[in-house]
């Protein structure tokens, strides 16, 4: 919320239109029992994206978000270790494999899969959209 407020404040003070791009997650669209606090924080990002879009559209500022699913990053490597420590999984890589088994495209995302969406949101091609959350999950939680 502070990021949206400060970015909007700077754009308004400069008299410019602009784009605010938030980072959500698939966890902001569906709840996961073992990750309730994380899910709550990402549901909040989605709600703040919607609220920010409504509040700032009249100032020429768009507010959108991207919501990655399982992305091959150090965060997921750590999460895999954490889930083993919690007893949710019993072998390295098992949690990530189980969690990503429902990805319709059959693989986890690479960071490069996310970059194109973020570039689109930052580009003039997205000028006529606001309040949207773009899922980058390979169809994992198809809605």
Each language-model region and where it sits:
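Residue(s) in the substrate-gating loop at a strand-loop-helix junction
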Residues: 25
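A conserved structural motif in NAD(P)-dependent oxidoreductases
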Residues: 90-93, 103-114, 125
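Alpha-helical segment proximal to the catalytic Tyr-Lys
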Residues: 9, 54-55, 127
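Active-site helix of classical SDR
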Residues: 4, 41, 49
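Short, small/polar-rich loop/turn modules that mediate ligand/substrate recognition or access, typified
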Residues: 57, 62, 129-131
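A glycine/serine/threonine-rich, flexible loop-to-helix segment
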Residues: 71-102
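Active-site loop immediately N-terminal to the catalytic Tyr-X3-Lys motif
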Residues: 30-36, 58-59, 106, 124
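Short C-terminal tail/terminal secondary-structure segment
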Residues: 30, 118-119, 130-143
């Amino acid at each position: 919320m502070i990021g949206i407020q400060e970015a909007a404040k700077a754009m308004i003070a400069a008299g410019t239109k602009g784009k605010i791009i938030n980072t959500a997650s698939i966890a902001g669209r569906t709840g996961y029992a073992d990750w309730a606090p994380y899910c709550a924080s990402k549901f909040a990002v989605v709600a703040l994206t919607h609220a920010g879009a409504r509040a700032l559209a009249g100032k020429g500022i768009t507010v959108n978000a991207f919501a990655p699913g399982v992305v091959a990053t150090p965060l997921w490597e750590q999460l895999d270790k954490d889930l083993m420590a919690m007893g949710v999984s019993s072998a390295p890589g098992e949690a990530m494999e189980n969690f990503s088994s429902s990805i319709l495209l059959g693989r986890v995302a690479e960071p490069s899969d996310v970059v194109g969406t973020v570039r689109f949101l930052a580009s003039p091609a997205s000028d006529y959209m606001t309040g949207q959350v773009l899922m980058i999950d390979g169809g994992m939680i198809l809605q």
